[in-house]
Swiss-Prot record:
It comes from the Eukaryota. The precursor molecule is cleaved by ATG4 (ATG4A, ATG4B, ATG4C or ATG4D) to expose the glycine at the C-terminus and form the cytosolic form, LC3-I. The processed form is then activated by APG7L/ATG7, transferred to ATG3 and conjugated to phosphatidylethanolamine (PE) phospholipid to form the membrane-bound form, LC3-II. During non-canonical autophagy, the processed form is conjugated to phosphatidylserine (PS) phospholipid. ATG4 proteins also mediate the delipidation of PE-conjugated forms. (Microbial infection) The Legionella effector RavZ is a deconjugating enzyme that hydrolyzes the amide bond between the C-terminal glycine residue and an adjacent aromatic residue in ATG8 proteins conjugated to phosphatidylethanolamine (PE), producing an ATG8 protein that is resistant to reconjugation by the host machinery due to the cleavage of the reactive C-terminal glycine. RavZ is also able to mediate delipidation of ATG8 proteins conjugated to phosphatidylserine (PS). 3 different light chains, LC1 (a cleavage product of MAP1B), LC2 (a cleavage product of MAP1A) and LC3 (produced by one of the MAP1LC3 genes), can associate with the MAP1A or MAP1B heavy chains. Interacts with TP53INP1 and TP53INP2. Interacts with CALCOCO2. Interacts with TECPR2. Interacts with TBC1D5. Found in a complex with UBQLN1 and UBQLN2. Interacts with UBQLN4 (via STI1 1 and 2 domains). Interacts with UBQLN1 in the presence of UBQLN4. Interacts with TRIM5. Interacts with ATG13. Interacts with MEFV and TRIM21. It is found in: Cytoplasmic vesicle, Autophagosome membrane; Endomembrane system; Cytoplasm, Cytoskeleton. Coiled coil: none annotated. Its main location: membrane. Residues 127-147 form a propeptide. GO terms for molecular function: phosphatidylethanolamine binding; ubiquitin protein ligase binding. It is a lipid-anchor. This is Microtubule-associated protein 1 light chain 3 gamma.
Length: 147
């Protein structure tokens, strides 16, 4: 009989651990692995098409590009080539696919030291507007009017 599958927690990572604990965790990671970037990748709360990842925390080389990281996430979700998804930084920014993780860390790291990314399918947004708000609001703040 196979072992039971681990079901990802429903609560976001930031709500599961205090700021101090997260900062301590990042400090330990960065001290031990100075060339790695601590990244938390979570499914958009209203996502229904894409599967949950088996883990949320990733330690990635700083020279890795977003294209390469996207490929890693895609393979962990076991998506077909025709299945597309967005990977948003801080729940609101689509970043350049040629950007390195070091650049993303420099520009988008949270106060706790993690970089937070959210993935969602195009179907989740359900409208023709750009997925990334240009006004600085997060996706939850934007109404999406049906056609």
């Amino acid at each position: 009989m196979p072992p039971p599958q681990k079901i990802p927690s429903v609560r976001p990572f930031k709500q599961r651990k205090s700021l101090a604990i997260r900062q301590e965790e990042v400090a330990g990671i960065r001290a031990k692995f100075p060339n790695k970037i601590p990244v938390v990748v979570e499914r958009y709360p209203r996502e229904t098409f894409l599967p949950p990842l088996d883990k949320t925390k990733f330690l990635v080389p700083q020279e890795l590009t977003m294209t390469q990281f996207l490929s890693i996430i895609r393979s962990r979700m076991v998506l077909r080539a025709t299945e597309a998804f967005y990977l948003l930084v801080n729940n609101k920014s689509l970043v350049s696919m040629s950007a390195t993780m070091a650049e993303i860390y420099r520009d988008y790291k949270d106060e706790d030291g993690f970089v937070y990314m959210t993935y969602a399918s195009q179907e989740t947004f359900g409208c023709l507007e750009s997925a990334a708000p240009r006004d600085g609001s997060s996706l939850e703040d934007r109404p999406c009017n049906p056609l």
